[in-house]
Structure formats: structure tokens, C-alpha cells
A protein has these predicted regions:
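Beta-strand/loop substructures that line and gate deep hydrophobic ligand-binding cavities in soluble
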Residues: 80-140
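A short, structured loop/turn motif at beta-sheet edges
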Residues: 16-17, 47, 70-78, 101-111
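Hydrophobic pocket/interface hotspot
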Residues: 19-23, 55, 69, 112-114
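Hydrophobic/aromatic beta-strand elements that line small-molecule binding cavities or substrate pockets
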Residues: 8-10, 65-71, 95-104
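Hydrophobic ligand-binding cavity/cleft-lining segments
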Residues: 1-50
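C-terminal helix/juxtamembrane-tail motif
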Residues: 1-2, 103, 132-157
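Intrinsic-disorder/low-complexity, polar/charged segments enriched in Ser/Thr/Lys/Arg/Asp/Glu/Gln
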Residues: 3-9, 39, 54, 64, ...
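Glycine-rich portal/gate segments that line the openings of hydrophobic small-molecule binding cavities
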Residues: 30-33, 40-91, 148, 152
Length: 157
């Protein structure tokens, strides 16, 4: 068993509050509309969107993941959540935690910082390729939302 952590940062011309609202607070409504080829639905299984809420993302390829929201700070545009079911949970991972923060870049846009921490099962080792694949999945979600917000400047304002 080991713990693997990595940080990822990306810049966006979209303001932090808009990205936070779209990607964190309203992802269950927006993401399936923007990415119907990969996301079938995102259902709120428990809660009201705040701390303790459990969301299930159903992918078009027939698998799902569930995550629990552990912390939400609307003022700081920050969220912490834990993957609790699906994907490689149990098989390769004992736990997976994430912290996402959208910060003002001083020019009207934002810097998105994501910290990921994985606790592996047994002697499973995360390879660099696994980490890169995780970063690519995050980008696949981020870019369509960013494009939508740029094309719709009043959305999530």
C-alpha cells in the first residue's frame, strides 16, 4: 500500500466564480448536456449539493463512479471530494481524494489548481502513464465547460 499525490494547474480566461459554479455546483446539470458522448447522467444520490452530498456519474460506456463532497467554500471557489465507488476503487485504489480551487489570475481569468491523492491497494504502483491519464480525464471535463462559458458570457455569472 502506498500513497501517490500530484498537483495539476491550468489557466483559463474565465473568471473563477463562473468556473466553480459550472464545474462544481452545477456539474450534474451542465456536463451531461455538454458531453453526451461520454456522460449519460450525473445523479444526486444523497444531499442537496453541499457537504455530504453523494453524486453518481453514469458514463455512456456502462460504468459509473460515485463521489462524496467533503468540503465546499463558495467564497474561495474551493471544493474537496472523495471517490467512493467505481472505476478502479477496490481493485487498485483504497481511496481517492481531490481538492479543486479556482483562483483569480488578476486579469479577469482564473488559475485552476487540483490536488489529487490516491492510496493504493497492496503493492499496486501508480505509473507515470496512470497519472497522465488522470490529468487527461480532468482536462476532458474542463475544456468543454470552459468553451461553453466563453461562448455564453452570461451563463453562471
Amino acid at each position: 500500500m502506498g500513497v501517490v499525490s500530484f498537483a495539476q494547474e491550468s489557466e483559463s480566461p474565465v473568471a473563477p466564480g463562473r468556473l466553480f459554479k459550472a464545474l462544481i455546483l452545477d456539474s450534474h446539470n451542465l456536463c451531461p448536456k455538454l458531453m453526451p458522448q461520454s456522460i449519460k447522467s450525473i445523479d444526486i444520490i444523497q444531499g442537496d449539493g453541499g457537504v455530504g452530498t453523494i453524486k453518481q456519474t453514469n458514463f455512456t460506456r456502462g460504468i459509473h463512479i460515485k463521489h462524496r463532497i467533503d468540503e465546499v467554500d463558495n467564497e474561495k471557489c474551493r471544493c474537496k471530494f472523495t471517490l467512493i465507488e467505481g472505476d478502479v476503487m477496490g481493485e487498485k485504489l483504497r481511496s481517492a481524494g481531490y481538492e479543486i480551487e479556482f483562483m483569480d489570475d488578476g486579469e479577469g481569468g482564473s488559475i485552476c489548481r487540483m490536488l489529487s491523492e490516491y492510496e493504493t491497494v497492496g503493492d499496486v504502483v501508480f505509473r507515470d502513464e496512470d497519472i497522465e491519464e488522470g490529468k487527461e480525464k480532468a482536462t476532458e471535463l474542463f475544456k468543454p465547460v470552459e468553451a461553453f462559458l466563453l461562448a455564453n458570457p452570461d451563463a453562471y455569472a
